[in-house]
Amino acid sequence: MKVPIETSPLAWLEAVEQQRRGAGLRRSLRPRSAVATELDLASNDYLGLSQHPDVIDGGVAALRVWGAGATGSRLVTGDTILHHELECELAEFVGACVGLLFSSGYAANLGAVVGLSGPGSLIVSDAYSHASLVDACRLSRARVVVTPHCDVDAVDTALRSCHEERAVVVTESVFSADGVLAPVSELHDVCRRHGALLLVDEAHGLGVRGGGRGLVYEVGLAGAPDVVITTTMSKALGSQGGAVLGSSAVRAHLINTARPFIFDTGLAPAAVGAARAALQILKAETWRPEAVLQHARTLAKICDLSELPQSAVVSVVLGDPEVALAAAIACLDAGVRVGCFRPPTVPAGTSRLRLTAHASLDSAKLEVARRVLTDVLGGCCVARR
């Protein structure tokens, strides 16, 4: 809808804001307190490590040695031994050859997808791909084919029609909105038949699947030369930052071509130190990933879902965005913080509550979740699917 400009070049914003309100799609910020007073079923702190004393100490120690900021791009003054140590440790953990840190998972996806495709390339992307992957596809200047969710046959068809010099298949390992696992092994078979690269975003797989090493590792593709992994330290590792994991050739190429790497300040030392400490805990305390999955199954049963989750994400589809938002607010008022996903994050008609399981949940917390979720969802059962 084109809104005529009247007295200000930003006068149109009010009309757009009214449209958002009318559609039940307005978003706003809700600052949380330092000490949570509600049960957290919304954050991505899957392993409960963001507040772990060793993780905090790791961040503080790096802060004291290296300072508050990286002070520049990795190619100028922002590169430290600390960055290289985390790259090596993370790559070894997931079974990749080498790694390259970025300032966020979003930046890692932009750098990897754009850097490994470009004009004269074909990108095949899942319809439920994260916004960072979608934006990367748009920026790549490659031909992009979007396939139905987890449809391997559609990917095969797209690759059969490829007339470009190279092709990249892009998927999340665990889809952030619905928690569904991608058919990574089957996608790799298709990619291998057609000589395509498989790029897997392990943002929600790291720390949960494959004993914490991710879904790519779980299905036996760790270190495969035609597989590139992207991930983040902001979820299971409780810190911040992103990484691309793959071959030495991929790393060298991205150092020279990935604009989010070349022109961005390096990841803050405190985030690197915290992520390193979290990774050590994940290696030592192998019970944490399985605890996440067990608690996710419990939450699914509480919500009376027909399918048990295979990740930390428990998706409760309510349909209408206003119903979903009202349910999320009701949960928060009752002491349980849950996620609320509405368009454009999810397709129209599939607005939902997104619950996330954490290793730190216990029987008392799960009982609180049961009481609140049963009461709130019981009030909107007509809209549930």
UniProtKB/Swiss-Prot annotation:
Pathway: Cofactor biosynthesis; biotin biosynthesis. The keyword Acyltransferase applies. GO terms for biological process: biotin biosynthetic process. It comes from the Bacteria. Its EC number is 2.3.1.47. It catalyses: 6-carboxyhexanoyl-[ACP] + L-alanine + H(+) = (8S)-8-amino-7-oxononanoate + holo-[ACP] + CO2. Substrate binds at residues 27, 130, 345. Keywords: Acyltransferase, Biotin biosynthesis, Pyridoxal phosphate, Transferase. Gene3D superfamilies: Aspartate Aminotransferase, domain 1 (3.90.1150.10), Type I PLP-dependent aspartate aminotransferase-like (Major domain) (3.40.640.10). Pyridoxal 5'-phosphate binds at residues 105-106, 176, 201-204, 232-235. Pfam families: Aminotran_1_2 (PF00155). GO terms for molecular function: 8-amino-7-oxononanoate synthase activity; pyridoxal phosphate binding. Its cofactor is pyridoxal 5'-phosphate. The modification N6-(pyridoxal phosphate)lysine is found at residue 235. Belongs to the class-II pyridoxal-phosphate-dependent aminotransferase family. BioF subfamily. Homodimer. Catalyzes the decarboxylative condensation of pimeloyl-[acyl-carrier protein] and L-alanine to produce 8-amino-7-oxononanoate (AON), [acyl-carrier protein], and carbon dioxide. This is 8-amino-7-oxononanoate synthase. It comes from Mycobacterium leprae (strain TN).
